[in-house]
Amino acid sequence: MATNRRVSRVAELIKREVSQMLINGIKDDRVGTGMVSVTDVDVSGDLQHAKIYVSIYGTEEAKAETMAGLKSATGFVRSELGARVRLRRTPEVTFIEDRSIERGTKVLTLLNKLENARSLDDIPSADDSLDED
């Protein structure tokens, strides 16, 4: 069992290496359909499994196509990680679509709408100022 510090260091290293692979290592055209970025990597305590969370910008169709390309490139990514990262065993790689950025954007949009509606309610109308006289 690896220490928490080692697990987090390995996760950061995997994140950096997979990000580099997304830029110029994976030749599958489907991966380039949507803009892809690695948002997080969870590595198990025994360093045998790595969940790679990716954020994909684009249409739902482009996202599905990109995820299919990433899933088919899993073997390549694992073998490249084995060559680039010095570990006794290369972890099994799983790509998971991270929709937290989308959800965050939706929440911010809703908050902005509420703030705009509230500020419109706070502005006194011309009729209100005439009634006070």
Curated annotation (Swiss-Prot):
PROSITE patterns: RBFA. Pfam families: RBFA. GO terms for molecular function: ribosomal small subunit binding. HAMAP family: RbfA. This is Ribosome-binding factor A. Belongs to the RbfA family. Keywords: Cytoplasm, Ribosome biogenesis. One of several proteins that assist in the late maturation steps of the functional core of the 30S ribosomal subunit. Associates with free 30S ribosomal subunits (but not with 30S subunits that are part of 70S ribosomes or polysomes). Required for efficient processing of 16S rRNA. May interact with the 5'-terminal helix region of 16S rRNA. One of its GO terms (cellular component) is cytosol. The keyword Cytoplasm applies. It is found in: Cytoplasm. It comes from Trichormus variabilis (strain ATCC 29413 / PCC 7937). The gene is rbfA. One of its GO terms (biological process) is maturation of SSU-rRNA. Monomer. Binds 30S ribosomal subunits, but not 50S ribosomal subunits or 70S ribosomes. Transmembrane segments: none annotated. Disulfide bonds: none annotated. It comes from the Bacteria. The keyword Acyltransferase does not apply.
